[in-house]
A protein has these predicted regions:
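Acidic, serine/threonine- and proline-rich low-complexity regulatory regions
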Residues: 242-254, 601-617, 639, 703-710
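A transmembrane helix-and-boundary motif of multi-pass membrane transporters/channels
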Residues: 1-237, 241, 248, 355, ...
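Soluble C-terminal extramembrane regulatory/interaction domains of multi-pass membrane proteins
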Residues: 195-196, 200-210, 253-375, 620-746
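Long, low-complexity, intrinsically disordered cytosolic termini of multi-pass membrane proteins
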Residues: 233-236, 587-628, 661, 671, ...
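Secondary-structure capping and boundary motifs in well-ordered enzyme cores
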Residues: 80, 84, 130, 252-259, ...
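Composition- and surface-driven signal marking solvent-exposed, interaction-prone regions
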Residues: 249-252, 256, 277-279, 283, ...
Length: 746
């Protein structure tokens, strides 16, 4: 017995660390990437394909599609994309390579369209099929322009190589530690709810004890929640592009994201007003019961649940009904008539905030039970607001830049014959197309692109020198495969957390492809290695010049577009635009993207303090979004008996709201916020006077509790919207965007 007891801990020590290591997403993805690369290389060598490097490169790019979904559709579309690109390349090179006036414009259109459809969202549900059209056309043209007589054999070789890589990646993604976007969304949603629960708890406690200030941890929670929303936004885009199941239920996922954002912002409303202790004391027990029920509901929603399992019931609705009954009882005692107007409005505002928390928690419960889960029958999909695809002008520009880079590269190959010809068009096209993902993944887009290109050139020179020194050791097949596996493992380990490809990750991918293409298992001349890396450098130079001089992707410009988009959608919401679901979804996503972009504005004119102010402005806009949304949803609920008094004041306020929105938009459009903003004090004071008139006349005395609640809640929403707008104006006035809003930092 003693020996067994002593042996058990040893076994556990050997077993559990291994299990823990394999549960790490970085290690899993590193292994998967290594396996996909080796499988593609093995099949290419087994089939005696001409250039195995194209198979390995295709596998690397395709492994960026992390999630399992509709494997049959993916396989068919990737095969069709590859074959279609090959036929297009064969047709262009075979018939028109000797007629540049036809060949180059047609080639430009094909590659441009492929790049555009790869990035277009949400219309492109099979993006990698379009990518493979462009990649295969480019690969056939790369080799075919110098040997058009053999274009059919070249097209067949490139087709088989790219199909090898595409199918290898699809096989590994599906069979080895498969990832499901719907399951990861559910887990990330629970994590975001846990973060929101901490803030709700803080603000509920502050409301109960009658204070407006909250602990300093609230700021950190706000930042953590922004990070959680960023993860969910990236999952929305990736899942919609890679999984037909996820895409079919996109409206449900969008609604979950909107409710989650509203829930978080409703918590901030709780401590916006300080309620008199004398009034809070009358409903103390009921408010505490509601707070306990909210905490219980969060515990239920954030707990792990098996797919198909019903959520446990909670006491939230019963607790709030008891609270509502107690408030009605206090109202009948005419406590609010004797209290000052500000006190009454503050209490009813808190009541409305608690009710909004209840409604959003109920909505999230309903949405959570309706989310598709693995192994369960799929719920009926809801219609999505984006029925028809729209033109995405950003990706039109990206496609044109990619097409222009590819054309310049082909012209160089045809008439100048530079070193490393196989790498030039590929490097130029991919670096030109992937501009926006650089920003999403933590890069700066085309900002400082010449500096980055210079540093990358130095890194490529170092890689060439290292490869010249190590080539003799890679002649052994086993050593070569082990080296490739560990390189791919290292690459996957360090890139899996990024939401997209960065500039450096893409350069690394193409360098790995060049390494495989040199085939170090056989003696490789130093000049061949140098020529191959020179080709990468030339292609990078073409992409850098085109990307930086033609529609450059700059974080400050993306931020400008996001801010203008937020303001225009808020104005549309105030104006009664019928497409509310679309507007709400955009208003939930755009601020998250804006916060991502703010972190990437790194230049001398934008200091740390300036970035902090920009982040504060985006968060103020998020608060404005929440207040405006609630205002629009409630303004038609104004009791008819109060409408003749309040409606004219509300309409005047809305006109002034739109004026401030126009001024803010003009500031960001012109790149200069050094101006005065209109004041809302007079219009808000007129609303308060109208409310006082209603109070003195006591026209709501004989109405149900819902009448004063709706009236004062709506009044408070107008006040909150006005305060949020003035806060946005105050923050905008302190910005110095004229120093960095333009095209700087080459």
């Amino acid at each position: 017995m003693t020996g067994k007891s002593a042996a058990l801990p040893v076994a556990q020590k050997l077993h559990w660390p291994l299990i823990g290591a394999f549960s790490d997403l970085r290690i899993r993805y590193g292994i998967k990437l290594g396996l996909a690369g080796l499988l593609a290389l093995y099949c290419a060598l087994l089939l005696r394909l001409e250039h195995p490097s194209w198979a390995v490169l295709t596998a690397l790019v395709m492994m960026g599609s992390h999630y399992v979904g509709a494997i049959t559709v993916k396989a068919i579309m990737r095969v069709l994309g590859t074959i279609g690109g090959a036929l297009m390349g064969i047709w262009l090179v075979g018939d028109y390579v000797s007629t540049p006036a036809i060949f180059l414009p047609t080639f430009f259109l094909v590659v441009t369209l492929a790049g555009y459809k790869f990035g277009q969202f949400p219309a492109s549900q099979v993006p990698y099929a379009y990518f493979l059209v462009g990649l295969t056309t480019l690969s056939v043209a790369t080799y075919g322009v110098t040997d058009p007589a053999d274009v059919w054999q070249i097209g067949l070789n490139r087709t088989l190589e790219i199909l090898d890589g595409a199918m290898s990646s699809l096989l590994v993604t599906t069979l080895v530690w498969p990832r499901y976007a719907r399951e990861e969304f559910a887990e990330s949603g629970r994590a975001a709810l846990r973060t929101a629960s901490h803030l709700v708890s803080m603000h509920t406690e502050a409301y109960i004890i009658g204070r407006t200030n909250v602990p300093v941890q609230a700021e950190q929670i706000d930042q953590d929640f922004a990070g959680r929303l960023s993860v969910l936004k990236n999952l929305l885009q990736a899942g919609a592009r890679e999984s037909t199941v996820f895409s079919a239920h996109l409206s449900t996922y969008n609604a979950f994201l909107v409710s989650l954002t509203n829930l978080f912002r409703a918590a901030l409303d709780l401590s916006r007003h300080q309620v008199e202790p004398s009034i809070l004391g009358r409903v103390q027990h009921e408010i505490q019961s509601v707070a306990a029920a909210i905490s219980e509901e969060f515990d239920i929603l954030t707990a792990q649940h098996r797919p198909g399992e019903k959520l446990s019931p909670s006491r939230l609705n019963e607790a709030f009904a008891a609270f509502e009954e107690k408030v009605n009882e206090v109202r009948c005692q005419e406590v609010f008539i004797a209290a000052p107007l500000d006190t009454t409005r503050a209490f009813y505002a808190g009541f409305a905030a608690l009710r909004l928390l209840r409604d959003e928690l109920n909505n999230i419960r309903s949405l959570s039970e309706g989310l598709p889960r693995l192994g369960q029958p799929l719920p009926e999909p809801k219609p999505h607001w984006n029925f028809l695809p729209t033109i995405d002008w950003f990706w039109v520009q990206a496609g044109i830049k990619g097409g222009l880079s590819a054309v310049i590269s082909i012209v160089l190959l045809k008439w100048i014959n530079p070193p490393g010809p196989a790498s030039i068009p590929l490097m130029a096209w991919t670096l030109s197309v992937f501009g926006r993902p650089f920003v999403r993944a933590g890069g700066t887009g085309d900002l400082r692109s010449f500096q980055n290109a210079f540093l990358a050139t130095l890194a490529l020179v170092a890689c060439a020198a290292l490869l010249i020194l190590t080539t003799p050791f890679l002649a052994d097949y086993l050593v070569m495969n082990l080296a490739l596996f560990f390189i791919l493992f290292w690459f996957g380990f360090h890139t899996i957390r990024a939401p997209g490809l960065t500039f450096w990750a893409l350069v690394a991918q193409l360098t790995i492809s060049t390494f495989v293409g040199l085939n170090p298992q056989q003696p490789v001349a130093s000049q061949t290695i140098i020529d191959s890396f020179l080709g990468l450098i030339i292609g990078m130079g073409i992409a850098t010049v085109v990307g930086r001089l033609i529609w450059p992707v700059l974080p400050q410009r993306l931020l400008r577009d996001d801010l203008l988009g937020i303001l225009s959608q808020i104005k549309a919401l105030l104006g009664g635009d019928p497409h509310r679901e679309k507007i709400q979804t955009l208003l939930a996503i755009l601020p998250v993207e804006a916060l991502q972009v703010v972190r990437q504005i790194r230049m001398s004119g934008c200091s740390e303090g300036e970035r902090a102010t920009l982040q504060a402005l985006v968060r103020a806009l998020q608060a404005l979004v929440t207040q405006t949304t609630e205002l629009v949803y409630r303004r038609h609920l104004l009791p008819e008996i109060t409408a003749p008094i309040l409606r004219p004041q509300f309409e005047r306020l809305e006109i002034e709201f739109e004026q401030i929105l126009d001024v803010l938009a003009e500031c960001f459009r012109r790149g200069d916020c050094r101006r005065e903003f209109p004041s809302l004090r007079g219009a808000l004071a007129a609303v308060d006077q109208a409310v006082e008139k209603i109070r003195v006349s006591r026209i709501l005395s004989n109405q149900s509790l819902e009448a004063p609640v709706r009236t004062l809640d709506l009044v408070d929403r107008y006040h909150a919207t006005g305060e949020a707008l003035e806060e946005c104006g105050r923050l905008a006035r302190t910005l110095e965007i004229q120093r960095y809003w333009g095209d700087y930092a080459l």
